Every structure is written in C-alpha cells, then in structure tokens.
C-alpha cells in the first residue's frame, strides 16, 4: 500500500520536535542533501530599482471639506456600508484599502482626490 502525502503529513504532525529533527537527519543522509536554506547573494542597486511594488495600501490622509463626496467614494471602493465608510473618513488619517494593485490604487487615489480628499499610496 502506497502512502499518500496526507498520510505522511499526519504522521509528521504527530511527532515530537526531536523526532522530526531525527527524521530530517535521516533524510539528509539517505538522499545526500541538506535541509539548510539556500543563501541568496545580495542584490545590487540596479536589481533593487528593477523591482516594482505590486501591492499598495491606499491611505486617506485627510478627508477635506467635502466629506459626503469622500464617503461616497470610500463606499464604492470598499463596499462598506454608510456607517463604516463614514467611520473611515472621520478617522483620517487611516487605511482605506490594503493589497490593491497598482492600477486599482491609482484609480482610487484619483477618485478620492477628485472628491476632495488627500490620499497617499504606500
């Protein structure tokens, strides 16, 4: 009878830490490998500049004078109810949305600024 991945995971989850360490050592010897994490060379400045941020946090820095318009936009962006959206706007500065794509974040910033708010993307 062949063991499934689930059987193996269940067996390992029932082991003590010492038993898992012994299992890892035995696997290293059996297969001639090590369980050490691979080290990565430090990236130069060119590589760091090439990495572009993919997820953004939309932060409402200030609601401005037109709070009603800003509340409407916050509701559209987040799907929050009126009370929750008002709490976000009244609580500025605060996060409107996390994990937004670049396009989504830029569109949200534009909409909020058109409504009279001051917005930051992080």
Curated annotation (Swiss-Prot):
InterPro entries assigned: Ribosomal_bL12, Ribosomal_bL12_C, Ribosomal_bL12_C/ClpS-like, Ribosomal_bL12_oligo, Ribosomal_bL12_oligo_N_sf
Any matching Pfam family: Ribosomal_L12_N
Gene Ontology cellular-component annotations: cytosolic large ribosomal subunit
UniProt keyword list: Ribonucleoprotein, Ribosomal protein
Coiled coil regions in record: none
GO molecular-function terms, A-Z: mRNA binding; structural constituent of ribosome
Database matches in SUPFAM superfamilies: ClpS-like, Ribosomal protein L7/12, oligomerisation (N-terminal) domain
Described function: Forms part of the ribosomal stalk which helps the ribosome interact with GTP-bound translation factors. Is thus essential for accurate translation.
Assembly information from the UniProt record: Homodimer. Part of the ribosomal stalk of the 50S ribosomal subunit. Forms a multimeric L10(L12)X complex, where L10 forms an elongated spine to which 2 to 4 L12 dimers bind in a sequential fashion. Binds GTP-bound translation factors.
PANTHER family with a match to the protein in the record: 39S RIBOSOMAL PROTEIN L12, LARGE RIBOSOMAL SUBUNIT PROTEIN BL12M
NCBIfam families documented for this protein: L12 (TIGR00855)
Family note: Belongs to the bacterial ribosomal protein bL12 family.
Name of the protein: Large ribosomal subunit protein bL12
Upper lineage: Bacteria, Pseudomonadati, Pseudomonadota, Gammaproteobacteria, Pseudomonadales
